[in-house]
Amino acid sequence: MQILKNSAKFSVFKKKIGNKFSIIKIANKSAKKIFDEINLIDTLKKNSKFYKTKIPQIVSKGIISKGFYKGKGYYEQTFIPGKTLSEILQNKYTKKNYLNRIKKNILIELIFSVKTSSNKKKAKQNQSIKNLIFMELKKIKEKKFYDNLFNIKKLNINNKSLNNIHFYIKKLNSFKKIRKLYSQNNYVSNVGHWNYHGGNIIFPKKNKTDFKLIDPDAKWKFNDPFFSLARYFYTYVHDTMEFNSYLISTKEFKKKINKFSIKLLWKKQIIKNYKTIFSNIFCSYFNDSQLKSNLSTNDFLRLNLNLCLCLLRGVNANHQNEIKYISKKSEKFKNKGIFLFLITNVFLKNFTNFLQKND
């Protein structure tokens, strides 16, 4: 078997029997996590024609009975050949025309999937997008690592002045349309894919736009179906963070920590590829006519609230206690949590500015 991915949580292998391939995913910690994912896949495929065709079939599942992984939970899934969206974007030879076709087709299909979600809804008062956002914010605030970033009133990122995250999240509540969405929870679901990230979208045929979906996120007990779509728009930010293709600079370690510069380390063509699909790294897609033409105003705001949630969750999920300094003068460094924290600041400023003009 070929190892494809290995982490503290999961190991993923590619298995070959004769001329056929399959994928085996093993839970390294809790078997419950893999069975939660199995149950989610089964539920999605059972209740949705979209997921029935998009998610590969599970061919076996259970507890491994012998060998190194004895006692571990697993499932085996049909192998889907091809490139992921992230791999296509990171290929400098990918044609812009192909990316435009991908963008058009994938937007239509992914938006359709979240707008037609008919999964069982939850109606408890505390189950809302507002509560999810404030829960993630609370988790960040509990990490002493971010105290200085939270406590200063003004930040400067790439020569633009911003307030801190807490200011913008509090400001969201001042807009009528947001308050209305906050007060509603009839669109919240307890079943969803929740993970339309570019690494989970596979294109089986070269230069074709038909795609498959893998790795739904079974950790959510409830969420807005639009979180799945937000995860798609989070791809550019996530990939930049995951592949360490960024550099943060500041001269403020001896003073007030308030001025930062973020530089992308991707090759120019790769940046162009990502921008074709996702606009720029700071999530400034608010004037994307193709996106707006496929979403009502209400749905567009839901998407952005979920992207806010996605970014905040990203800070928590990718938190690092250590800062990796690139220069001896401690002016240039990398830290995934700080990178996402700063990107979240910029997104929230753009979002609140958009609301001021359109509320």
Give, region by region, the residue ranges found by the protein language model:
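ATP-binding glycine-rich loop module of kinase domains
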Residues: A8-T43, S86-K92
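Short beta-strand micro-motifs within the conserved protein kinase catalytic domain, predominantly
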Residues: P56-G73
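Structural motif at the C-terminus of the N-lobe alphaC helix and the adjacent alphaC-beta4 loop
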Residues: N39-I55, S113-T116
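Active-site activation/catalytic loop segments of kinase-like enzymes and analogous catalytic loops
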Residues: F211, D217-S289, L309-S327
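A glycine-centered beta->alpha junction motif in the catalytic cores
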Residues: G73-K96, K219, C308-K332
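Active-site acidic catalytic loop and adjacent metal/ATP-binding pocket
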Residues: V12-K16, N173-P225
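Conserved kinase catalytic-core helix
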Residues: L44, K83-N185, N190-G192, I281-S284, ...
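Protein kinase glycine-rich loop
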Residues: Q2-K5
